[in-house]
């Protein structure tokens, strides 16, 4: 386990030295990784850092409002509504790697736009060790490492948490006084709900995934999962009222893990599973079927794409 006091001191020094007198922007996604990196960097250089929260349209329910509230102490915070642009980039894209690259490139384009406005030359990211391992091992690319465009319009990229695991990041977040809604938040992929929608990503599918994930997080909170969410897999025939429907299949995934490198599917009570399917299929009109994923990691990854 990392020595938090020493890490925070060293990270602040690293950030200050790397940035000098230059202005930087940081990718603030709302997850614990980027939020902790933003808090670290803001403590190091203040408003010299411009935190950029991009609403991609692929975020969790209520996430944008939460970010505005939690980080309102950062006077330099920028919130960018880019949802239409992200959906335009994802139109017709079905390959998981192409999705990640499209999202990563659009992220950087959004940051470059803000960087030009504030004359920023540096980019700070919340990359952690498992991100780098999966990317270097070609298991999958991560939008903040493997999905960057070949040519990035910044002079440097600073990744102060590149050697930390998720539980260590949480320790740092608590040390920095971040609210529990951030420090204890379940992991959320950089590309957002796009990697929880199999096939083409559309606003309608994402809306289904967002609401289903909200239900899963609510129902499974007592189980204290390392990560729990819903994914939209495809379509299947169902019956609603007196009508046959061809609705979405939603998979529920809930796992236990220490650092995300390996994970075990949680054993949920039958009553809990039935309550999940009742709420998801009963309140989301577009859903016809709910399944529970019992696969560990390995052989599966935690996320679907």
UniProtKB/Swiss-Prot annotation:
Q: For ATP, which residues are the binding ones? A: 29-35
One GO BP on record is: GMP biosynthetic process
Q: Enumerate the PANTHER family for this protein.
A: GMP SYNTHASE [GLUTAMINE-HYDROLYZING], GMP SYNTHASE-RELATED
What's in the GO CC field?
A: cytosol
Protein name, as recorded: GMP synthase [glutamine-hydrolyzing] subunit B
Oligomeric state and partners? Answer: Heterodimer composed of a glutamine amidotransferase subunit (A) and a GMP-binding subunit (B).
What Pfam families would the database entry show?
Answer: GMP_synt_C (PF00958)
Catalytically driven reaction(s): XMP + L-glutamine + ATP + H2O = GMP + L-glutamate + AMP + diphosphate + 2 H(+)
- Secretion signal span: none
Briefly, what is this protein's role? Answer: Catalyzes the synthesis of GMP from XMP.
């Amino acid at each position: 386990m990392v020595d938090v006091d020493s890490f925070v001191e060293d990270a602040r020094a690293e950030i200050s030295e790397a940035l000098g007198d230059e202005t930087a922007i940081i990718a603030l996604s709302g997850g614990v990784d980027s939020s902790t990196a933003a808090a670290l960097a803001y403590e190091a250089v203040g408003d010299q850092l411009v935190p950029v929260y991009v609403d991609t349209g692929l975020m969790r329910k209520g996430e944008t409002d939460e970010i505005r509230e939690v980080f309102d102490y950062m006077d330099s915070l920028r919130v960018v509504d880019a949802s239409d642009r992200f959906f335009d980039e994802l139109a017709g894209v079905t390959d998981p790697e192409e999705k990640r690259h499209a999202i990563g490139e659009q992220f950087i384009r959004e940051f470059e736009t803000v960087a030009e406005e504030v004359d920023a030359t540096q980019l700070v990211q919340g990359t952690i060790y498992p991100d780098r391992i999966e990317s270097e091992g070609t298991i999958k690319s991560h939008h903040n490492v493997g999905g960057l465009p070949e040519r990035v319009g910044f002079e440097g990229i600073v990744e102060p948490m590149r050697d930390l695991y998720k539980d260590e990041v949480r320790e740092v977040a608590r040390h920095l006084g971040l609210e529990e809604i951030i420090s204890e938040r379940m992991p959320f992929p950089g590309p957002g709900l796009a990697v929880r929608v199999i096939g083409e990503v559309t606003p309608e599918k994402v809306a289904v995934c967002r609401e289903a994930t909200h239900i899963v997080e609510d129902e499974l909170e007592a189980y204290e999962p390392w990560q729990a969410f819903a994914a939209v897999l495809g379509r299947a025939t169902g019956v609603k009222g007196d009508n046959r429907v061809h609705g979405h299949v939603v998979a529920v995934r809930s796992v236990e893990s220490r650092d995300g490198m390996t994970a075990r599917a949680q054993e949920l009570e039958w009553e809990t599973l039935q309550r999940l399917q009742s709420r998801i299929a009963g309140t989301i009109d577009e859903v016809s079927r709910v399944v529970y994923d019992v696969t560990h990691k390995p052989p599966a990854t935690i996320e679907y794409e």
